[in-house]
């Protein structure tokens, strides 16, 4: 029987937000709860598979409930913690979890492999490569023999000397937005199991760092040139002698040396693996200046002026600077303050929906007042305290979304959201 341990820490941390992520922000899974996270263990369909094109899904497209590659495999749960994007993780929290993972692996006895389920953009004060540090600590415990297969977000970072060196099989999502998150995890698990079962030993790896730093707003795989770039991945991965290839955009919202794009591949034919990785990396570099924002850009004052003057409705403005989907504080009030300077909005001539500002105290007060109730609040500006700070509002509660928020949280913790 093949024994494979499961562990990992999964969060996207912006180093430009003052918010610190704590243990309370994470769903912590151990034992049976951890095993039930993965559909190939529970013999369930892959979440979101109907949203993934056949070319991207590959062998996972028509996966049976009982995966043949998962036969006679013992999955050993260690620890997995995942959170919504946020700020850097408290150092003591990370070091506690690192110790728990290492202790768990030491007590687990012999394992043939490790399934390393990570994001790749976790930040911790005092560390410039958290995932690299974690895999190095794991290798110190288990040694060089167990085969490590890593599943990552394409907005993660691959450090050559630590993460790339410490893992044997690395793959990442092929879609942004990440509808294929669970397809990618399943591909990583299948590849690890099949490789261990084959008896061929560890594959040949190749990596090319691409000196590009791009935000997610420029790299949707639904648009060019990212569509063509990621379209190359399954084609190269299908070559004889190549097992898999991944393209990492990297993470723009952390000030760390490892933050850059990369292409990684592995297989048994060294020339084809290296040639395939090089081909994709060269195309990536060639089209680097073609990655553009999907809409016109402007300052917030100018953007609101344009929205008010426009005849197009609805008019959507996206503040990509305070982006909670990439770890922003989500309580910066600059845009709200600018909106409230326009009499067309404050006077009711135009309606505006502002989504969202993080302020749990305001939510509690609104919940207490109830639908239809009035509250006086100082909204936002409590986490990121830079000007203009909290905005004083007299507000009426028009709906209660507490149940919806609880459902979203539960869905995230159960692994039902594609980007979890």
What annotation goes with each model-predicted range?
Residues 1-67:
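N-terminal amphipathic/basic leader segments beginning at the initiator methionine
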């Amino acid at each position: 029987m093949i024994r494979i341990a499961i562990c990992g820490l999964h969060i996207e941390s912006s180093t430009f937000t003052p918010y610190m992520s704590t243990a309370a922000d994470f769903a912590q899974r151990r034992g049976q709860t951890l095993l039930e996270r993965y559909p190939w263990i529970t013999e369930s369909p892959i979440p979101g598979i109907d949203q993934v094109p056949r070319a991207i899904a590959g062998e996972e497209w028509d996966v049976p409930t009982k995966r043949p590659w998962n036969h006679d495999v013992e999955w050993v749960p260690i620890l997995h913690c995942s959170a919504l994007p946020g700020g850097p993780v408290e150092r003591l929290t990370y070091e506690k979890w690192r110790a728990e993972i290492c202790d768990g692996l030491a007590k687990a006895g012999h394992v043939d492999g490790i399934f390393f389920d990570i994001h790749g953009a976790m930040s911790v004060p005092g560390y410039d490569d958290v995932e690299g540090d974690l895999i190095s600590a794991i290798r110190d415990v288990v040694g060089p023999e167990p085969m490590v297969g890593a599943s990552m977000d394409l907005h993660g970072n691959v450090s050559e000397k630590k993460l790339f060196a410490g893992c044997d099989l690395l793959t990442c999502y092929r879609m942004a937005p990440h509808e294929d998150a669970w397809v990618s995890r399943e591909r990583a698990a299948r590849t690890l199991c099949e490789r261990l079962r084959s008896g061929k030993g560890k594959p040949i790896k190749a990596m090319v760092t691409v000196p590009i730093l791009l935000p997610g707003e420029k790299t949707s795989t639904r648009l060019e040139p990212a569509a063509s770039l990621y379209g190359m991945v399954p084609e190269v991965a299908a070559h004889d002698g190549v097992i898999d290839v991944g393209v990492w955009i990297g993470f723009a919202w952390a000030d760390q040396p490892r933050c850059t794009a990369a292409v990684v591949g592995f297989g048994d034919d060294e020339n084809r693996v290296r040639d395939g990785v090089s081909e994709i990396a060269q195309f990536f570099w060639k089209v680097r200046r073609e990655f553009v924002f999907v809409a016109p850009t402007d300052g917030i004052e100018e953007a609101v002026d344009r929205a008010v003057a426009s005849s197009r409705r609805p008019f959507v403005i996206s503040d990509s600077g305070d982006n909670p989907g990439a770890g922003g504080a989500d309580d910066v009030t600059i845009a709200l303050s600018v909106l409230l300077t326009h009499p067309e909005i404050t006077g009711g001539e135009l309606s505006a929906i502002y989504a969202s500002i993080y302020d749990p105290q305001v939510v509690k007060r609104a919940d207490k007042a109830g639908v239809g109730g009035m509250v006086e609040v100082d909204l936002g500006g409590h986490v990121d305290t830079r000007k203009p700070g909290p905005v004083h509002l007299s507000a009426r509660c028009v709906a209660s979304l507490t149940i919806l928020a609880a459902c979203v949280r539960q869905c995230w913790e159960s692994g039902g959201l594609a980007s979890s």
